[in-house]
Each structure stands twice: as C-alpha cells, then as structure tokens.
Amino acid sequence: MAQNIFRGLGVALITPFKADGSVDYQSLKRLVEFQIDNGADFLCILATTGEAPCLTQEEKDKITELVKDVNKGRVKILKYCGGNNTAAVVEEIKNSDWSGIDGILSICPYYNKPSQEGLYQHFKAIAQVSPLPIVLYNVPGRTGINMKPETTCRIARDFPNVVAVKEESGSLDQVDEIIKNKPDNFEVISGDDALTFSMIASGAAGVISVIGNALPKAFSRMIRLEFRGEYEPARKIHHSFTELYSLLFVDGNPAGVKALLNDMGFIENELRLPLVPTRIATKQKMSEILRTLNI
C-alpha cells in the first residue's frame, strides 16, 4: 500500500523567463537550490504556477531533467500530468519517463465539467496505469467543477496508489469532511497559502505553496511549528503574511510571486502570454511588505 511522501512544505516552482521570452535555466537552478537550502520538503514542477500550458514539450523535458540534476535526490519531486482528455492523460503517463520523479499531480478535468461519477472514472483510469503515487488536484476556481468529499474519499479507498489530494476548494468545511472520512493512508494537502495554517490545524499534511517560491524558510518554519503543536509562534508567522497572501494573486498567478522574486533579485519579471506582469502599484506594495517582514 502506497504511503503519502509529500508532507510539509511543497513548493510549486515557477518557470523563470528571460526578456526574450526563453526559459532562464540558470535562474531556475538557483531557485531550486534556494528552495532546498531553505526548508522545502518537496518540489512540484510543471503545474499552474510553472506556466506549464505555455511551455513546449522540449522545454518541459529540459526543466524536468534540470530539476532532477540539481536536486540529486535531496527532496521529493512531484510532477504534474493531467488534463481534460482522459485517454490522452493515460497515454502520457504510460509513455513518459518517470525516473527520478516521486509522484504525479493530476488535476480534475477542466472545461468539460464532468459529473462526480465522471471524475471517479477519470482518476480510476489514471490510477490503473500510473507507476507512481498520485496526488489528486481539486481546484474548482480553475476547473469549473468541485470534486466532492465523498468522491475524493471513494477514489482514495478504491485505489491505494492515490495517496493525497491537493485541496483548493477554499472550503474548510470540505477539508474537514475529507479528513474525517478518508482512509488512514490518504492525506490532504493545502493548495491555498492563506488557508494552510487552518488546514494543518485541522489535520492536513502540508501545502503545495506559491509563496514558498520566495519565502520558503519562513513558511516551512510555520509548518514545522504547527506540526510540533507550537501554534502561537506559527500563528504569528501566518499573520505576518496576511496582506501578502492577497496581493500575490490579485493580478493572477504566478504574476505576483514572480514580481516578488524579481524584487529579491532572483529572476526577471517576465511571463508568457496570456499572463502579464503584475501592476506596478501591486508590485510596489509587495516590495514594501517584504522590507518590513521580520522573518
């Protein structure tokens, strides 16, 4: 029976770009080292925050190899593989090289808006061919469909290689319902930085974080404090990020965190269309907050 190995701080890695629009592989190397050196427990690559829909297959392959090479097995790697064409996702899983990868993150089918039974059958097909543990990804704000707790738990019970769900419904009631009814070998992972403190307090195993790209040390400390039951110092860290949580997403993701990383000197402030950089006023406000953070 597979066990969830994705606990603590997972960072949803951005993909840095140069001014000419090409992938900035040197900055990506530095960013991976920065994450590992500052408390990231695992890395999540080529998902939404990594702007994967705007990358070529060649770029995705090169990013995968780079992250594996820089990581050298120090932390776990979760790689995205999902879509709204079940057969295509199944074929991609069957035909991909998964060496050096520890798990697959797979989103609920978007745009099609399947029923709960359709969601179950989609993930059943994936689970039956996957050579690696699977983390489900429920994000209704992007997919247009919410996977209900009973569906999540049904999948978890029926397919032991489905080890967790990245839950980004925004509903703490839904999180509690999953945690209450899930099998013992299945975990809930926060997909929302702002709700991570509350979700871990309710029993979540960690987070796949956006803010962790820029502030992994402080965010991982908050999580570790919570795991030890030291809620007051953890709460102080959480509250210090309250305004930043909102600003990071006001102009879209990963525009906010890329602006923050640019301010820190890590990357150029570049995205690929249809995404554009965050507004100047938003960037300036985040810069002010960054300078005042006592972390």
What kind of feature is each model-predicted range?
Residues 8-16, 34, 38-40, 202-204, ...:
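C-terminal alpha-helical cap/extension of soluble enzyme domains
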Residues 1-4, 291:
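Basic/polar N-terminal segments that are highly enriched at the extreme N-terminus
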Residues 28, 60, 64, 89, ...:
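A general structural signal for well-ordered alpha-helical segments in protein cores
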Residues 3-144, 154:
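Active-site beta->alpha loop and helix N-cap motifs at the rims of alpha/beta catalytic domains
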Residues 55-58, 91, 116-119, 147-149, ...:
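Short secondary-structure transition/capping segments
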Residues 128-129, 142-249:
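Catalytic alpha/beta core domains of metabolic enzymes, predominantly
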